[in-house]
């Protein structure tokens, strides 16, 4: 059974990453899950358990992305980016830092996928219009994609990884935020410093800001633009209310997304059908299918091996526990994708005989490693693969070798500093 469960997992993962002839990841994951069920690797009760675990996470994620797609069509993100350019006042280094800050804000509220896939094309178009060379464009593109993941820690909704882990361990919105806001600030500061050190010679010191258009010119629907701010406030309140009422956060995000869609349906700035079609619905199928496949590893006893490793690491104290878990999840994410990684690690943490603050350290370090680790390799997350594809369509080609060389140098120090932020949070607060 161990061999069969492992084989099903590896083959499913291979096809998810390979996507031959555009094979949808949701179909691939469900096929793997179906094989796992008919071969007896997982039971029907496991299927119901998995559905109960991931439905809230995936629907929340889809709802947030839907909202972000509408905001993108309205022009909110481009409006924000233009403001950042004007605030830079022709200083290239300031512009670099401000773009990173904008990416961090977008990632926090609209998830890492939304930040990377929506903000990157906007930034790319802007630096091209300014007249930057290909060498000068590269740092801004990498920074836009990198910061989307490294600062997707503060809110449960900032990353699908966060939602799944929080749901699995029944962590509320406020409790999660209180533990991850400081690590996220550490990650943001470390990202700015490390990215600047790495790209300092390629970033232009000055640029001509005379031809930058006015922020209001980016707004495609003024009425909907104003409504957007109200939607954002209501969305934040929805997150808080879900904490106290114990109503699944997907209910709030789903209702808000639906109302926003209805308000936007008569706007000339967007096509509602295209927006709905553009939402990552396949993530729902992928999450359920992949989780079922991972449950096969649990049933075969493979996750128990990892649980024993975590118990061993925890014997050396909180600092070693956090660093060990963080780098284990980062490494696994980089070689087999962060979605199955966070699932496997969460199950192993639950199975381990680790309690109290040490267990809390494992839980949050797993999230940090699974959020940041994917930046080491192109296959670390599905969003990165899609991000690279979008860039290729826009005539910006980044080879896997170039990505890996850049990713590993930038990610390791940022990951280490972020984990230190988590350690300080747990021992001080």
Curated annotation (Swiss-Prot):
Task: Provide the GO MF annotations for this entry.
Answer: arsenite transmembrane transporter activity
InterPro entries under this entry?
Arsenical_pump_ArsB
Bilayer disposition of the protein: Multi-pass membrane protein
Query: What broad class describes the main subcellular location of this protein?
Result: membrane
Q: Name its cellular compartments.
A: Cell membrane
Q: Name the domain of life this protein comes from.
A: Bacteria
A GO BP entry is: response to arsenic-containing substance
* Chain ranges passing through the membrane: 3-23, 25-45, 50-70, 99-119, 137-157, 180-200, 222-242, 244-264, 275-295, 316-336, 372-392, 408-428
Q: Which Gene Ontology cellular component annotation is one that this UniProt entry carries? A: plasma membrane
Ordered alphabetically, the record's keywords are: Arsenical resistance, Cell membrane, Membrane, Transmembrane, Transmembrane helix, Transport
> Which family does the record claim for this protein?
Belongs to the ArsB family.
Q: Which PANTHER family match?
A: TRANSPORTER ARSB-RELATED
- Function field: Involved in arsenical resistance. Thought to form the channel of an arsenite pump.
What protein name does the entry list? Arsenical pump membrane protein
Per the UniProt record, the lineage of the source organism begins with: Bacteria, Bacillati, Bacillota, Bacilli, Bacillales
